[in-house]
C-alpha cells in the first residue's frame, strides 16, 4: 500500500503540517488521527463543510456528490472523500471561496 505526504496549509489559521496518508485513507481521516481541528459535517462528500483546494499533486474524490465540474476543475476537493494519489499540498478551510 502506498503512503503519500499530504501538506495541509492555511495562512490565516497558521496551519502548515505534513501528514503521511495511506492511499486508502481520506485526508480528513488522517487529519483527525493527527488531532487537527478541521471543519466537517457529513463525512460522505455531500456538503461543503470540509472543502479544500489542491495546490499541488493529484487526488481521487470520485465519491463526492456536492461539487460541480467547474469547482472540481478549479481544484476544490472535499477532504472527507479525498484520497491522495501523489504527494500533495492542500489549502484547508476554503468553503467561503466556493462560488
Curated annotation (Swiss-Prot):
Its cofactor is [2Fe-2S] cluster. GO terms for biological process: electron transport chain; nitrogen fixation. Keywords: 2Fe-2S, Electron transport, Iron, Iron-sulfur, Metal-binding, Nitrogen fixation, Transport. Residues 4-96 form the 2Fe-2S ferredoxin-type domain. GO terms for molecular function: 2 iron, 2 sulfur cluster binding; electron transfer activity; metal ion binding. PROSITE patterns: 2FE2S_FER_1, 2FE2S_FER_2. SUPFAM superfamilies: 2Fe-2S ferredoxin-like. Binds 1 [2Fe-2S] cluster. [2Fe-2S] cluster binds at residues 42, 47, 50, 80. Pfam families: Fer2. Belongs to the 2Fe2S plant-type ferredoxin family. PANTHER family: FERREDOXIN, FERREDOXIN-2, CHLOROPLASTIC. Ferredoxins are iron-sulfur proteins that transfer electrons in a wide variety of metabolic reactions. Donates electrons to the nitrogenase. This is Ferredoxin-2. It comes from Leptolyngbya boryana.
Amino acid at each position: 500500500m502506498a503512503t503519500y505526504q499530504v501538506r495541509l496549509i492555511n495562512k490565516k489559521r497558521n496551519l502548515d503540517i505534513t501528514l503521511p496518508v495511506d492511499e486508502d485513507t481520506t485526508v480528513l481521516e488522517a487529519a483527525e488521527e493527527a488531532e487537527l481541528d478541521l471543519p466537517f459535517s457529513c463525512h460522505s462528500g455531500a456538503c461543503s463543510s470540509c472543502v479544500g483546494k489542491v495546490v499541488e499533486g493529484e487526488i481521487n474524490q470520485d465519491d463526492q456528490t456536492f461539487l460541480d465540474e467547474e469547482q472540481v476543475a478549479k481544484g476544490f476537493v472535499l477532504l472527507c472523500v479525498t484520497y491522495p494519489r501523489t504527494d500533495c499540498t492542500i489549502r484547508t478551510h476554503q468553503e467561503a471561496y466556493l462560488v
